[in-house]
Amino acid sequence: ILQAASQLLCQKTFAAMTMDDVADAVGIAKASLYKHFSSKDDLCCAAVVQMLSQVRAYLETLEPEAAPLEKLRAVVRWSLQRLLAQEIPEWPGSHSPLRTMLREHHDCLIEWLPVSQCLEQWIAQAQQQGALDAALPPRVVLHILYARACDPAAGFLQDAGLYDNAEIVELVLRTSFDGLAARASAAEL
């Protein structure tokens, strides 16, 4: 049920998804679905909690000795790969009822907090090492990385068909971590 809800969140968004859609995707009666989840809100929150637990599990697979910047890049890479495979949805916009609901849902906050703390720790370490701009507040960097991990631009690039998914991931990583400014060529150095 949660997998179907996640897929539908990716394909249709929260506003367009219905409990009928989920019941049809799972192959059960709508009444049976309501035995598990009392509302679409509860179902979608449970799907997001499951996704966040997958993120936490992924964080635990990263080598503790790896450089903090490399761990941050790995998390964004992993998230973008999941986004392009429609395994995780784009993050809802600021006016989305889903975003408001997720911010108020206890289980979402319980899953979200350790992820944010881990990423903020890596951000602070990367700043101390000079790998990230230390003038930027860590919370700003955190939210920029969250935005990149659920960036609709990746989907736009995918829809255009000019790049394969691996190229899109690398392009988003490059613009996110290296910026848009022109680089000095080897001849200029």
What are the residue ranges of the model-derived segments?
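Residues within the helices of the helix-turn-helix
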Residues: 20
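Short secondary-structure transition hinges
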Residues: 80-120, 140
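Short helix/strand-capping hinge loops at secondary-structure junctions
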Residues: 8-17, 37
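A short, glycine- and basic residue-enriched loop/turn
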Residues: 16, 31, 40-41, 91
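Alpha-helical structural segments
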Residues: 3-7, 11, 24-25, 42-62, ...
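Short hydrophobic/aromatic patch on the recognition helix
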Residues: 27-37
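C-terminal peripheral helix-coil segments that are non-catalytic and often amphipathic
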Residues: 74, 81, 117, 121-129, ...
